Amino acid sequence: MASIWVGPRGTIKDYPGFSPSVDAEAIRKAIRGLGTDEKTLINILTERSNAQRQLIVKQYQAAYEQELKDDLKGDLSGHFEHVMVALVTAPALFDAKQLKKSMKGTGTDEDALIEILTTRSSRQMKEISQAYYTVYKKSLGDDISSETSGDFRKALLTLADGRRDESLKVDEHLAKKDAQILYNAGENKWGTDEDKFTEVLCLRSFPQLKLTFDEYRNISQKDIEDSIKGELSGHFEDLLLAIVHCARNTPAFLAERLHQALKGAGTDEFTLNRIMVSRSEIDLLDIRHEFKKHYGYSLYSAIQSDTSGDYRTVLLKICGEDD
């Protein structure tokens, strides 16, 4: 059975001739030797798929009675450590931890919440919610409820529920009906019916939404994005615009997130690490393509000029190559 965490356009694939015991031993030597052998760690962890890394983690635990992630944490530091630990974490658990991190402490990282909840499939969301509950003994929905409010909260909870239709079939009649519902809920009435926007944008499949946006343009002579900007505001507006962007082109949405993370004075490593790791086996090739198309330079060169040391090396290995 194909994993829901693997797509055809990743930069990292299964390693042929893979042996968990050989890799676990090599990693142990790299960590335990005099000084850490970062090169070996990077090469092994970026040249194995996540499924293979999980087998290394099991083998490592069985052979050395140590958690690989704990040994990595003890031996590495900074952003480099964060990426390496992310690489040995199962995808659903990684996303669960990222969601927790975005809601922890003072202030919520709404952009991270939006990015994760809009780009994961319904089946992925169900696994993430399970992982979240297993680790934190609280439901993801409960934490979202206590950290957000209003229409933004309602929409996030709908996405977190993993109820978006996943079928690739489109229904023209439904698209016309939904387009009219959106038009009546916004442009065509005094005041806005936010629930209708949430219902359509959070539950319909992406191919279905694309058709709905075309129908919307026919009815209103406006792009749905312009109506959302005119009718809504705040984080709820940001969330719905993100859904529209993802429905049209998820890799382009994530390329824009990476561009924002890398441009300007500081680097947003939290976002950079999350997207590079979580999309490395799904669609990072497409994200690279969109990045180059929109910004005129490659993602590889952006990472190269914005990061340094082992952290740069591991990100470039995940990225794959220059475009």
From Swiss-Prot:
Entry-annotated residues carrying Phosphothreonine: 267
Modified residues (N6-acetyllysine): 177
N-acetylalanine modified-residue sites: 2
GO biological process: defense response to bacterium; neutrophil degranulation; phagocytosis; positive regulation of angiogenesis; positive regulation of endothelial cell migration
Keyword Disulfide bond included in the entry's annotation: no
Keywords (A to Z) from UniProt: Acetylation, Annexin, Calcium, Calcium/phospholipid-binding, Phospholipase A2 inhibitor, Phosphoprotein, Repeat
Segments annotated as Annexin repeats: 18-89, 90-161, 173-245, 249-320
A Gene Ontology molecular function term of the record: calcium ion binding
UniProt-listed Pfam families: Annexin (PF00191)
GO cellular component term, pick one: phagocytic vesicle membrane
Domain comment quoted from the record: A pair of annexin repeats may form one binding site for calcium and phospholipid.
Family: Belongs to the annexin family.
Task of the protein: Inhibitor of phospholipase A2, also possesses anti-coagulant properties.
Name listed for the protein in its UniProt record: Annexin A3
UniProt organism field: Mus musculus (Mouse)
Gene this protein is translated from: Anxa3
